[in-house]
Amino acid sequence: MVLSSDLLRDDKQLDLFFASLDVKKRYLLALSGGSDSLFLFYLLKERGVSFTAVHIDHGWRSTSAQEAKELEELCAREGVPFVLYTLTAEEQGDKDLENQARKKRYAFLYESYRQLDAGGIFLAHHANDQAETVLKRLLESAHLTNLKAMAERSYVEDVLLLRPLLHIPKSSLKEALDARGISYLQDPSNEDERYLRARMRKKLFPWLEEVFGKNITFPLLTLGEESAELSEYLEKQAQPFFSAATHQDSQGELPCPDCLIQQAFLCKWVMKKFFNNAGIAVSRHFLQMVYDHLSRSSCATLRMRNKIVIIKPGVVVID
């Protein structure tokens, strides 16, 4: 089955992604059987990527065992190795099913990655997934540098995660499959409004687009990209100040010269990283208090859980 279309032939981002891929390695594909992962399945075949398909059967539906069998048969027809992992009732638990399932799913993928010495794990996250994450983080008041959750290439410990579809909307993936008569699974949990993602997908995004009168997915993607660029920029700007900081166990000292204090956003970002490196999670309110003392060249002693933060003109000390 070939998926070549105007979308894929003209997609320079996909071309760049696969041009940089080490084709001598064998990869893993997380294959749910939904439109997203099935599209990626055929795309990897078309691009000549060697991979093993990994399917996790959560046992949530009476049809899940049959669906797993059909995916195994598909892989056999296409000459793709297939690995099935079926969760037991004990493994699934009875609370926070969505999060528990995700943890089990990734744990098995990471274990398979190491056992098979794979080159990476392909995941079929797409533009809508990314936009949902950006909006969720924005509404949760995440820092401006932390809005983008997923990258085309990222590492979790020693595991390489590959997401080549982040710039492509789900509708385009489904259209490509529908145009070729390729059937895919419809997961009812994607429509189950007990889950936040489903509520965002079914209610929040359509409502915002109706009220706003425009598609909001790609503006959110742009915001996520700029968030990642801002993070990279701040890392470079902050490096001289980090280099001057000292850490010993959970204590530390951060010099804050006037040139840093005069840049409020950068100064608070540097301080946040400084506290994080000492194992201290700080709120925006706390950072603002510390910054206010620095900007006024005033002294203060603040308690933060079991730590004492001492502020003097031009320096912050963790004791």
Curated annotation (Swiss-Prot):
Pfam families: ATP_bind_3 (PF01171). It is found in: Cytoplasm. Keywords: ATP-binding, Cytoplasm, Ligase, Nucleotide-binding, tRNA processing. GO terms for biological process: tRNA modification. Disulfide bonds: none annotated. The keyword Cytoplasm applies. Its EC number is 6.3.4.19. Gene3D superfamilies: HUPs. One of its GO terms (molecular function) is ATP binding. Ligates lysine onto the cytidine present at position 34 of the AUA codon-specific tRNA(Ile) that contains the anticodon CAU, in an ATP-dependent manner. Cytidine is converted to lysidine, thus changing the amino acid specificity of the tRNA from methionine to isoleucine. The N-terminal region contains the highly conserved SGGXDS motif, predicted to be a P-loop motif involved in ATP binding. This is tRNA(Ile)-lysidine synthase. It comes from Chlamydia pneumoniae (Chlamydophila pneumoniae). The gene is tilS.
